[in-house]
Amino acid sequence: LFNREDFLKNLIKRIHDDAENLEKVKEDFMRIVREMTPIEVAKIEQELVNEVMPAESIQLMCNIHLDVFKEALSEDEIDVEPWHPLHILVEEHRDILNRSKELRGRAGRIKNGDLTQSDIQAMANLLDYMDEVEKYFLKEENVLFPYLERHGLVQPPAIMWKEHDEIRELRKKLREIIDNGTIEPAKVFDLSIGIGEIFSNHIYK
C-alpha cells in the first residue's frame, strides 16, 4: 500500500541527498502535500527535525515548502463566503503583501535619489501600519504557537517567532531613522527591503 507519510519523509530527505534535482523534488512535494493537511505535513517535518536532520536540510526544506505553497496559493482562489475567517485571513495577508511591496517601492525611490517629503511621510505611515500588524504577531505567539507546541510541532513556531523578532528589530531601526529625520538612503533601502522580504515570506507559513 502507498503510504503518503513515508513517501513525504523520503522526499524531504531527498532535499539534502539529491540537492541537484530540487525542481523534481518540488514537483513531487507539491503533488503529495496537496493530498495532505498542513498539520500532517508539519508533523512529519517535526519528526525529521527530532531525528537530528542537518540544519542546512531544515532550511532547504522550509524554503521548498514555502515555494510550493506560494505557487499553490497563486494558482488556486480560495472560494469561501466573505464573512468566513479564512476569507478574512487571506484578505489580511494580501493587504500585508501590498504594503510590503509599497515599502520596497518607496525604498527604491530613496536609493535612486528621488526622495521627497511625501516619500518620508508615506514610509512613516507604512511603519504605523506595521506596528498594527504586531497585534497579529502577538496573537500567533500567545495562542497559535502554544497550540502547535502542545501537539508536538516545535520547529514551525520557533522559525516564525524568530522571523517576528527579525521584523521587530528591522522595524525599530527604520523607525529611528525616519523619526530622527536623518535619512541615509542606503541604510533605509536595506532595512526596507529586509522588512518587505521577511513579511512577504512569513505570511505564507
Please give the residue ranges for each predicted region:
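Small-residue-biased structural context
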Residues: 1-205
